[in-house]
């Protein structure tokens, strides 16, 4: 029940907003996203629903990734309506967004959002951070956004996922409707490419000019000479 829900601390968490938490054994009795704390599918707490992994790697999803120049990385957003299945509560107008900053810096944080018009709260978000020893930027790889679930398999999403419009999700089709329960959950994946500024090598050459007066029989080079 709502009364049994626990408000989780957010002081050191890169997610929000603060909201009640639920468990597999005691799911929500209303529509809310990514608030179950013991989901083994994503390693425990669903509030940590944004992850990073290098394309082509089988490594675990992580919240922090040190980038290499020219490499591509997946950003994953988990999407799960936590309403108990027996309540038949369907989330409406479900939209996913990924904010990929265009800044150049040594750390760049991306933010994933999942929204629904009848969810409480309407929007939940989580962050993950890329880093490098040198300044870099992230570029969204156009056409890379996908949604994977049991209802549709893998479905292409529009590039609007990385702007304010976002991408509409769904279960059996992209109609914005996602019922409550694990079987209706899904994953959004997006590719980004790292462009690292390469440090410039020092090319300045210090030249020293020396002369000698051959007519005076000088055999050593000096910086000045008497005529």
What are these regions (language model features)?
Residues 4-13:
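C-terminal segment of classical bacterial N-terminal signal peptides
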Residues 13-227:
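Exported/extracytosolic protein signature
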């Amino acid at each position: 029940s709502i009364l049994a829900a626990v408000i989780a601390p957010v002081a050191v968490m890169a997610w929000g907003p603060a909201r009640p938490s639920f468990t597999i054994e005691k799911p929500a009795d209303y529509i809310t996203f990514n608030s179950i704390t013991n989901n083994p599918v994503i390693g425990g707490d669903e509030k940590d629903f944004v992850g990073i992994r290098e394309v082509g790697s089988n490594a675990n999803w992580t919240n922090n990734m040190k980038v290499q120049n020219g490499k591509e990385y997946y950003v994953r957003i988990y999407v799960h309506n936590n309403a108990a299945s027996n309540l038949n509560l369907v989330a409406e107008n479900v939209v996913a967004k990924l904010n990929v900053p265009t800044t150049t810096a040594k750390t760049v944080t991306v933010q994933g959002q999942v929204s629904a018009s009848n969810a409480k709260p309407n929007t939940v978000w989580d962050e993950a951070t890329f880093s490098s020893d040198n300044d870099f930027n992230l570029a969204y790889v156009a056409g890379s956004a996908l949604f994977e679930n049991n209802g549709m398999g893998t479905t292409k999403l529009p590039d609007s996922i990385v702007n304010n419009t976002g991408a509409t999700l769904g279960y059996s089709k992209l109609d914005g409707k996602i019922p409550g329960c694990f079987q209706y959950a899904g994953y959004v994946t997006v590719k980004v490419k790292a462009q690292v500024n390469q440090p410039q090598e020092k090319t300045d050459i210090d030249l020293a000019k020396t002369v000698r007066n051959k007519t005076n029989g000088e055999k050593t080079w000096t910086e000045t000479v008497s005529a």
